[in-house]
Curated annotation (Swiss-Prot):
Keywords: Cytoplasm, RNA-binding. This is SsrA-binding protein. GO terms for molecular function: RNA binding. GO terms for biological process: trans-translation. The gene is smpB.
Length: 148
């Protein structure tokens, strides 16, 4: 598994409820831009239209060697999942406080672009502070155990 890009803010800003692996419908120039890692997922999210899941605001830069028929960098991209997974995700999206966002994009062993999407619930400010305290304590604990 070759990770292209990771959205690190997801783990800090949200509680992760459940994870899913989804295929992404892409065109050729988008795949080439992904291989060059010219992508941003900071503002991206998942929406549901007609019982299909779409990845919105995923910015894949235009491929420089492509001809004039290059892709739109922020177009919605369809996610490929099993029907049971789509029902589960869309059901959770309708609940208050739940959101679906991509955690990271990667190429699997066969070279196919995939997205790890997660169902999340937003953290409050005090939850974020507890996360920072736990992370700092783990660093300090490891430093003490190493003897330095």
């Amino acid at each position: 598994m070759d990770i292209i890009i990771e959205n690190r803010k997801v783990r800090f800003n949200y509680f992760i409820i459940q994870e899913f692996d989804a295929g992404i419908v892409l065109i050729g120039s988008e795949v080439k831009s992904l291989r060059q890692r010219k992508v941003s997922i900071a503002e991206s999210y998942v929406t549901e239209r007609n019982m299909e899941l779409w990845l919105c605001n995923l910015h894949i830069s235009e491929y420089t060697q492509a001809n004039t028929k290059n892709h739109n960098p922020t177009r919605p991209r369809k996610l490929l999942l099993k029907k049971k997974q789509i029902y589960k995700i869309s059901g959770n999206m309708k609940n208050d406080g739940f959101t679906v966002v991509p955690l990271f994009l990667y190429f699997n062993d066969k070279g196919i672009a995939k997205a790890k999407i997660v169902i999340v619930k937003g953290k409050k400010l005090h939850d974020k502070r507890e996360t920072i305290k736990a992370r700092d304590w783990n660093r300090e604990k490891n430093r003490i155990l190493r003897g330095g």
